[in-house]
């Protein structure tokens, strides 16, 4: 009996994907829930597993092919196993993964024919390692990412000197863009082509908020079991500024302006695969600890590739913190259909004039990129001034002033 291999549901509003890699060939034997292939959507990578025991008898779509939900991409000649019944053909086990996922583990292969799970296999392949020479410290001798990294760190590096007669073509590498990278590229270009993007800047004296955090961070963490960072201050300040300037929390819908009376704040997170912007829902109803916890949880899921489409969809305004990478100044690009994005940057000590005297203060540049079709320059400037005043006087945030 032939069982079809079909593309499973990919989440709300997602209908297309790209086959990243098949891990089985025609004629290969497979077991129920064994990894068959990886597919990439706009935001995440998913595993498609075998619906039953059997042999691969047909592969209709190969690596790099675009596919749609419900499309047949192959067939398995089912072999009935008395110990393992065939699973329902429509109930594929899916798991979002990310390159070099620290939680991905695999059985240590007994021979070269064994196939490693995608994230570990990629790390092993990129570093030209033999998995048989890697000692697994996981349960049952399984190999974890840490085992691979330990092997890399303890293996001498040999640097090859390129031959002088090599052509430029031989010294280049062509790699197909992932669906996530293509989506990022397309959305950023669409944003620039559609919106009338303008960026305005201001700077913030971080002295008071740094002092406040230093004074209460240990007590805060002890009570709430989450660290007190600066992002919660900026999220709360941003919400107050959005309430003051509602057009920045709105979007253009055809010939109408859609004003949103809720505050779902997207927080940009960099991952190995690219930038994602998970959303903190109803952030205006959260306390500082709730905001910090939500951001921490979403960032962890992003790095592990476990974000769902619901984590990424929607959002009324976004915040991007290039300061964590050392950025001093930037012009962030709007995440459509939103109308604005706040860019945070590195805090560094600079000489500033305070009451006619030069003092050294920890200063941060902030930037607001906004759609000038819906937001006037005065509104953009007022938005940043509001954030500046709240961060420089954090007691106003705490007292809701």
UniProtKB/Swiss-Prot annotation:
Residues 2-77 form the Lipoyl-binding domain. It comes from the Bacteria. The active site is at residues 372, 376. Signal peptide: none annotated. GO terms for molecular function: dihydrolipoyllysine-residue succinyltransferase activity. Gene3D superfamilies: 2.40.50.100, Chloramphenicol acetyltransferase-like domain (3.30.559.10), E3-binding domain (4.10.320.10). The modification N6-lipoyllysine is found at residue 43. Keywords: Acyltransferase, Lipoyl, Transferase, Tricarboxylic acid cycle. Binds 1 lipoyl cofactor covalently. Its cofactor is (R)-lipoate. Residues 115-152 form the Peripheral subunit-binding (PSBD) domain. It is an enzyme of class 2 (transferase). The keyword Lipid metabolism does not apply. Pathway: Amino-acid degradation; L-lysine degradation via saccharopine pathway; glutaryl-CoA from L-lysine: step 6/6. One of its GO terms (biological process) is L-lysine catabolic process to acetyl-CoA via saccharopine. It catalyses: N(6)-[(R)-dihydrolipoyl]-L-lysyl-[protein] + succinyl-CoA = N(6)-[(R)-S(8)-succinyldihydrolipoyl]-L-lysyl-[protein] + CoA. InterPro entries: 2-oxoA_DH_lipoyl-BS (IPR003016), 2-oxoacid_dehydrogenase (IPR050537), 2-oxoacid_DH_actylTfrase (IPR001078), Biotin_lipoyl (IPR000089), CAT-like_dom_sf (IPR023213), E3-bd_dom_sf (IPR036625), PSBD (IPR004167), Single_hybrid_motif (IPR011053). The keyword Transferase applies. GO terms for cellular component: cytosol; oxoglutarate dehydrogenase complex. Forms a 24-polypeptide structural core with octahedral symmetry. Part of the 2-oxoglutarate dehydrogenase (OGDH) complex composed of E1 (2-oxoglutarate dehydrogenase), E2 (dihydrolipoamide succinyltransferase) and E3 (dihydrolipoamide dehydrogenase); the complex contains multiple copies of the three enzymatic components (E1, E2 and E3). Belongs to the 2-oxoacid dehydrogenase family. E2 component of the 2-oxoglutarate dehydrogenase (OGDH) complex which catalyzes the second step in the conversion of 2-oxoglutarate to succinyl-CoA and CO(2). This is Dihydrolipoyllysine-residue succinyltransferase component of 2-oxoglutarate dehydrogenase complex. It comes from Rickettsia prowazekii (strain Madrid E).
């Amino acid at each position: 009996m032939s069982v079809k291999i079909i593309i499973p549901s990919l989440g709300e509003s997602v209908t297309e994907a790209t086959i990243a890699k098949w891990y089985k060939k025609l004629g290969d034997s497979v077991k129920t829930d064994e990894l068959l292939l990886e597919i990439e959507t706009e935001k995440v990578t998913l595993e498609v597993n075998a619906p039953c025991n059997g042999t691969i008898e047909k592969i209709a779509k190969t690596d790099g092919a675009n596919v749609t939900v419900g499309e047949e991409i192959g067939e398995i000649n089912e072999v009935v196993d008395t110990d393992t019944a065939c699973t329902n053909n429509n109930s594929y086990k899916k798991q979002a993964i990310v390159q070099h996922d620290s939680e991905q583990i695999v059985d240590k292969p007994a021979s070269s024919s064994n196939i490693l799970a995608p994230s570990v296999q990629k790390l092993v392949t990129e570093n030209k390692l033999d998995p048989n020479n890697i000692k697994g410290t996981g349960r049952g001798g399984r190999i974890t990412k840490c085992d691979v990294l330990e092997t890399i760190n303890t293996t001498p590096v040999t640097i090859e000197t390129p031959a002088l007669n090599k052509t430029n073509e031989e010294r280049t590498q062509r790699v197909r863009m992932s669906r996530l990278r293509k989506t990022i590229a397309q959305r950023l270009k669409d944003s620039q082509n559609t919106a009338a993007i303008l960026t305005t800047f201001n700077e913030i004296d971080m002295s008071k908020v740094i002092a406040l955090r230093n004074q209460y961070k240990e007590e805060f963490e002890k009570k709430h079991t989450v660290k007190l960072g600066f992002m919660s201050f900026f999220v709360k300040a941003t919400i107050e500024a959005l309430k003051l300037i509602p057009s920045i929390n709105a979007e253009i819908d055809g010939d109408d302006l859609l004003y949103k009376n809720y505050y779902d704040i997207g927080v940009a997170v960099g991952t190995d695969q690219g930038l994602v912007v998970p959303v903190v829902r109803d952030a205006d109803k959260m306390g500082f600890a709730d905001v910090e916890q939500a951001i921490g949880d979403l960032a962890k899921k992003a790095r592990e590739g476990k974000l769902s489409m619901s984590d990424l969809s929607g959002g009324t305004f976004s915040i991007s913190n290039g300061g964590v990478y050392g950025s001093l100044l930037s012009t962030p690009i709007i995440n459509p259909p939103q109308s604005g994005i706040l860019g945070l940057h590195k805090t560094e000590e600079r000489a500033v004039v305070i009451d006619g005297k030069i003092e050294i203060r920890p200063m941060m540049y902030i930037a607001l990129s906004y759609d000038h079709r819906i937001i006037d320059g005065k509104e953009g400037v007022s938005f940043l001034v509001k954030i500046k005043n709240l961060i420089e006087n954090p007691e106003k945030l705490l007292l809701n002033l």
